[in-house]
Amino acid sequence: MQGTRDVTTKPTVRRSAFAAPIAVSACFFLTVLVFAPGQIYYGNTMDFPMLFAEMLPLLTAAALLGSILLSGTLISLPRGRPREVGISVVFGLALLAWLQGNFLLWQYGLLNGSPIDWASHWTHGLIDASIWCLVLAGALFGSRYVNPIAFWGSVALIVVQASGTALLASRSSDRWINHYSFDQSTRFSFSRDRNVVILVLDTFQSDLFQELLDEDPGIADWLSGFTYFRNATGGFPSTAPSIPLILTGRYYDNAVPFQDFVKSTFKSASLPQTLKAANYHVYYNNLYYWPSLYADPSIASHVLEKTPRWHDAQSRRWASGLMLLGLFRSLPQAGKRVLEGAVARTTPSLAWDDAYGEETLPMGPHARGDARAEGDIAFFRAMTSLSSVAMRTPAFKYYHLWGIHAPLLHDENLRPVTVPYTRENAKRQAKGTFRLLKGYIETLTKLNIYDQSLLLIVADHGTEFQPFRPRLVEVDTRLRTGGSAPPVSTRNSFGLPLVLVKPIAATGAMRVSDAPVSLGDIPRTVTSALGMKSASPGESMFDPGLRPNRPRRVLKYNAEHLHLTSRYFPPLTEYVVSAFSWFDESWQTTGRKFLPGQPPINLQR
């Protein structure tokens, strides 16, 4: 019987001898290379251009390799005290990495390559060092007490972290663009029968076009069939909420998280959804602005289900960067200082990413940090050379370009410049942009699709140029609310976007309209022009029944405080514009303010 007991117990002892080294090694490397990166990812999902699942195989492989090497080293130690101490110390390191990454998180600032002011964090360094020394000393000198709990302690720590990461993932914002890939082959493919094109020139303020028109009346001739809506308002002071307003007609008011608003509005009676349902081929550009857009195969024609790409160079680069950040997060301050240089070199390269291909790069200098990116010039050259009439169904295109957004990139002759962001310099770039636009019109004409196209050339918002003294030839007195002073809108020029619209088959020199319109009217204008029924809010810009004092809504916030990785916007203040939008006298606050996630409050009560 004794022999039988020996036979049955030896394998158990053998498994126990391997179990603890494997468990503590796996716990340590999973903590640093999988769970810490997972917490970073799901705490900042809006910053990562791919799914965590695409990086997880590489993270897991690195953790597995490290676990094999470390557990092999522990197993190779002599039995008894040496192995006992080794297991205890590794378990202590795993515990410390977990504590550091979850409880000893100090605010060192944004990891964007800027130096960290360690001197102001000396107390944090002292706390880190004290805790690490205390735990490691306990693991080293109290190994006989730590070793018996190392196996189950490691298992428990793995389970706790896996559960915590899963919970964080379930609560994190979903970056919809990570789920899809995009077919760019139809970027400039048009229909011979019918096209709807919205061309957004970022920040192109309406009065700049008025000045271009005053100086060169010939613009009205080559903009054949267009109507210039001078009395237009935007909805917001920056791009993010303006794109949904243009494509859905709906205003974001902080009632729900911004990404939830974008997804729900695009999926319910948005212009892309309506046209896709009507058998239009729907294409978006530029996906650099993805936080303000939503697309899936039911809304956009160039969206494809994504094939995971964990093995490509892009995934390897992001996975390695995430592992470095996970290690940085898991180390005490002394270790962080050693890694600071590597982190400073790595994080800027991850800040702007071309993971979705050329079409996601902004029409400006952000791409790869290149301050001389050609932007709109490259777009129009590509459009001129690549456009074709190959679409068998009606086509809808949304192109969002750099316009006159800061920094300014070229002059009126399309030569690259580095100049201050002033009104005069912006006007020079505007002249160059309209040279490009003329070529765009000529291309559509040569393709024999100009007459068959509904074209909108608009801005998403204005800016705060000073002085703001637009030169108006004449303003209907019904569009004034008081006085006869020159038009001045120094406080509200952000809400004055360019709006040019050419209906299908419209001809003749460009005309000027002072009808009270808004960017939120674009969906209804398009569907009305196409003879389609739509649930979009707003009015058709060509409706002759628009009242001269029609109120239009504008929501203002401090754009400098807006971060698209945040769930909500800064507080929004509501205005109503009831007369000609270029006059301060036409702008009135309603007293309503929209705070993040709260019902609106009325400050006038």
Regions found by a protein language model. Name each.
Residues G3-R605:
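Catalytic domains that recognize anionic headgroups
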